[in-house]
Amino acid sequence: MTLMISTSVLDAENASRRDALTRDYESLGDRLARRGIDIDAVKAKVAAYGVAVPSWGVGTGGTRFARFPGPGEPRNIFDKLEDCAVIQQLTRATPAVSLHIPWDKVSDLGALKEKGSALGLSFDAMNSNTFSDAPGQAHSYKFGSLSHTDSATRRQAIEHNLECVEIGKALGSKALTVWVGDGSNFPGQSNFTRAFERYLDSMKAVYAALPDDWRIFTEHKMFEPAFYSTVVQDWGTNYLIAQELGPKAFCLVDLGHHAPNVNIEMIVARLIQFKKLGGFHFNDSKYGDDDLDTGSIDPYRLFLVFNELVDAETRAANGFDPAHMLDQSHNVTDPIESLMTSAMEVGRAYAQALIVDRKALAGYQEENDALMASETLKTAFRTDVEPILATARLENDGAIAPVAAYRASGYRARVAAERPAVAGGGGGIV
């Protein structure tokens, strides 16, 4: 397997921190043992956990107003895979990459799969793009795609999704994620019912072409790019879609795609209960779909989401097999650093949820002891589980301190010298 960071750099970085980590791990193990928790069992689950990296996430993001290019930006999907391999090598928590078509489209899929394999990466869910126009396409998505009033435009969007499935099959992917920007900006612009009927008809055509071992994830979003209405605006509509399409259709939850202050963890619980939780796009937000680093704003909410996931995992909930992926835009940070810290924050939330005293929590819930139920969750959340995460990385040939190891490696400066600088800047999220 090709390693992007020198093992000598990694060994030196780990050597300077190993003794302190050993003491911290032993100390935490003693404290958890007093609570009846086996730290090694928690570490094993954390070590086995993985979250997919979005291919577009390793490039510099932007806003509606401007995009400021960064040094060493990937020129193509092959460069992106190398950056993703750095994240996996140091965190040992991101073994798969999620591609976006047509952004990542190549003529030689065999070479792409071989590159991923050489770097120790697999390919997660495929992402279609009918929210922007690709060069040379016959019909514009300005006024919609899968729900467009024009049948030829809808057929073009359907064919694009079918192409994504074919590309995914060649790469070993097993899922298709569909998010559309379809909607309206003015009252009366769109007939809500007819637009949704057209969307469902289009999605049924895509669903019918899915291989037997594939899943399709539909993603809801309250607003943007349409600001009056979106065709798939919330989890209720998303659930209706999954029910209408069939057993291979599931709801994908992006943490930034909800109205402010929505109880996302309860939505997660509902979708688990009715066997329609497909997975997540993890990120964080303050106001809307901000696509900030996961755990950077509201780590407690992330923990509460994982509390529901671990609850389902613990009771072996029927049909529970969610896919996990990061989906962020990195405007002012090194994307590799942001994705590494985000992957670690997801792992942190998982570890914290694993140490919740579920027997005590269930008892307090039955007794309607609101305060102690809340404190039970907070006890787990306030526990510093970093020694578990770091030890899991170390034992899996990763970095105790991934960001420090990355900076010591000089990787960004090296690729900046190899990859031509992107001239100028413009608007656009990616």
Curated annotation (Swiss-Prot):
NCBIfam families: L_rham_iso_rhiz. One of its GO terms (molecular function) is metal ion binding. Belongs to the rhamnose isomerase family. InterPro entries: L-rhamnose_isomerase, L_rhamnose_iso, Xyl_isomerase-like_sf, Xyl_isomerase-like_TIM-brl. It comes from Rhizobium meliloti (strain 1021). The lineage of its organism: Bacteria, Pseudomonadati, Pseudomonadota, Alphaproteobacteria, Hyphomicrobiales. This is Probable sugar isomerase R00627. Its EC number is 5.3.1.-. The keyword Manganese applies. Mn(2+) binds at residues 257, 289, 291. It comes from the Bacteria. The keyword ATP-binding does not apply. It is an enzyme of class 5 (isomerase). Its cofactor is Mn(2+). Pfam families: AP_endonuc_2 (PF01261). Keywords: Isomerase, Manganese, Metal-binding.
